Amino acid sequence: MNGNFQIRKVAVLGAGVMGAQIAAHLVNANVETLLFELPAKEGDPNGNVNKALDGLKKLDPSPIASPARITFIQPANYDQHLEKLRECDLIIEAIAERMDWKSDLYRKVAPFVNEHAIFASNTSGLSINQLAQAFPENLRHRFCGIHFFNPPRYMHLVELIPCTSTEAPLLDQLETFLVSTLGKGVVRAKDTPNFVANRIGVFSMLATKHHAQAFDLGFDTVDALTGRYLGRPKSATFRTLDIVGLDVFAHVVNTMRENLTDDPWHKHFELPGWFGYLVDQGSLGQKTKRGIYQKIGKDIHVLDLHTKQYRLSDAHVDDGVKDILRERDWAKKLAGLRNNPHPQAQFLWAVFRDVFHYCALQLEHIANNARDLDLAVRWGFGWDNGPFEIWQAAGWQQVAGWIAADIAAGKAMANTPLPAWVTEPSRTGVHTQQGSYFPRPLAGERADVGWISDSASTKIHDPALNGGCATLIHPTPLGSYQPRSQLPVYRRQLFPDHLLGEERLYGETVFETSEVRQWHMGDGIAILSFKTKMHTISNQVLDGILRAVDEAEAHFTALILWQSEPPFSAGANLLQLMQGVQEPAQDSGLFGKLKQAANRVKYTVAGGGGLGDVLNAATGNVPHVEAVVAKFQQVSQRLKYAQVPTIAAVDGLALGGGCEFSIHCTRIVATLESYIGLVEVGVGVLPAGGGCKEMAQRAAQEAQRFANDNRIDVFPFLRRYFQNIAMGEVSKSAELAREMGYLRQSDRIVLNRFELLHIAREEAKALSATAYRPPLHQRQIAVAGSTGIATLKAAMINMLEGSFISEHDYQIGCRIAETMCGGDVEAGSLVDEQWLLDLERRNFMELLATEKTRARVEYMLKNGKPLRN
């Protein structure tokens, strides 16, 4: 295969749930995509595909980054458009999990597959080698499995499975495409039933089901125990089954039962009678609105196995068990569970024990190393830590001893002893800085990935491995450690997804405080990372950014704001800000004095009075709060006008102040899954860190481009920015953030978050190489003025009268309108940035003086969600 092989066009065969969503994610990544389905029996031959595309629009969360993207999926059918397959570099089959149906389709399309194309099946567990037999022999070297997890846009994992004929370079090309273009985490799996993630994840669910029945625990109690307390999705176990679909889960378990007859746990690959009863009834979970759970009105009901009726969910976790689960140290957590006699604790230990036992026995059969198994479970099932990571963190030898003791006592689900490599006296785990463990085959046998020598290191060759080969290092008597993939695409991941046992060395420190750290990697680019929870912005963070800009200007060529984990920033530290307001209020009634001061002193920006003049009548920390707001604005402006380019590397939430800092940077580099917005209305204030000013300025710039006879009408361009801020809208993707105006056309969208820092650095280098100069300060910004304010108020009055917004929402909206329209001036008036910043600050402080804003802030701090009062 040519080294410059490019995947330019992709065909997806099958417009079912998975096929349509895979096609959607391909166009999310700007890949030209054809979606095939059987022709409709009546009307438009593409009717079946078009129906599937309509269905995409109804899914929540949305599989498409922007509604406009769906128009880029090209409908096709097997009767009219097979010739179009010749143009495709990658063909993904995603029809139903029937070997006979897939084989028939392969024979039908094979004559139209071009000689350079890759053909891949999205099967979730059927044998890739058996599927390959239906393909012409001369094409089998370009055939493999490519298992996306549902939903494809959001689930990071893709399993890549070769057949015996698959060319190693083909897999390398495909992995590169999946990782960098589609943003996926790829695990090379062996051709065993259900591959890696489903094999372990489904077994974990079966073990949970088994022990829940043994300890007589309700479904809702099990979910309360096996969700966030264990670092797993909130949907936990049985709620996850409802989301997946009980029929789908039954199919996966059936695959294990039929194809894993020699598995020591085979007797447990059965579903209980109640499960079959629900499936036969058509109670399949979320898609049928009833399964193990059922929502009745606003209440969640759960199936009670004792009565066979649904009851109100009322899960209760024992206080003692809850204390154990809150323990962060896995060694203490597992010991606490094993030693606590409460059924809930014994249930959890039993599940951990049997999952560890299963992973240890199956590792060499299903995966190429322990790292692949752990990452597959993390990326495919949403666990914070993989099974081996947890075992290693809890103390390898201690846990191995517990498992062995329980096996000997007949407590485990299978009586097969642990493999010998597990109990090597020197073993402390499976993950090291040098690599992750790979079990050695028995003497005289050939492993699926080749022979392992007893020398210091050896290369093994097999297409199942990344790059077709790997160097195994530090062999033990029973195995070796395999380093991470050496494929060039992974050089773009400066800090790949971290495993316990691996070090993370974040460059050389420039300066560090309790809340920020500035560092560099020796390339002349400074990086600033926050250390606060959710990367919120405190007064100390503001000071840190100002210092970081100074350091960057003095010693570096660029500054990047980047966090090692999402989110980018959840915004201002409300608790710190409000403590600054409220501390002296115990005796002085500060909020009342703020309100009195605002009512007594009438002022405008035009009058030249600073906000401090207004608040002189108020005591306590009001000047401090105003100073913090002014510092927010100073930081935003400093980022915008720094003498070196500033890059916001955004991943996840960028809300409030986090959004404001981003939009002021020279460039934003954002992952597709970035959720950006100015949400201050939720706590009863307006964006005052330059957000209102910046969006008003962007509206003026857009209006300037469409000016007629030197008359600039800002309002048509301002309206959408006002609505975004007044409604607290948050983008559901970086693509939508661009449509909302938070990202500019020059900003970049990245599909793989582990490449974010690499691309941000490349942007910084490119900007610096152009002899970067910051923009000139804007001194003539056209505003919508009093006419714009009146128009926006009229629209809000209609919403108020229609009960779409509250009275306080209206008051907040009026303040936002005044700020963004430039105050009480004529439409088309020209103002400078400081004028708009002063308006921001004034209106923020006046809103902060109101009782209803105070209630919103306090409610948010207490409940973590907005109050609409």
Roles of regions detected by a PLM:
Residues 465-466:
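Short linear segments in intrinsically disordered or otherwise low-structure-confidence regions
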Residues 1-462, 473-557, 563-566, 575-631, ...:
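N-terminal glycine-rich phosphate-binding loop for ADP-containing cofactors
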Residues 659:
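Short glycine/serine-rich donor-binding loops of glycosyltransferases
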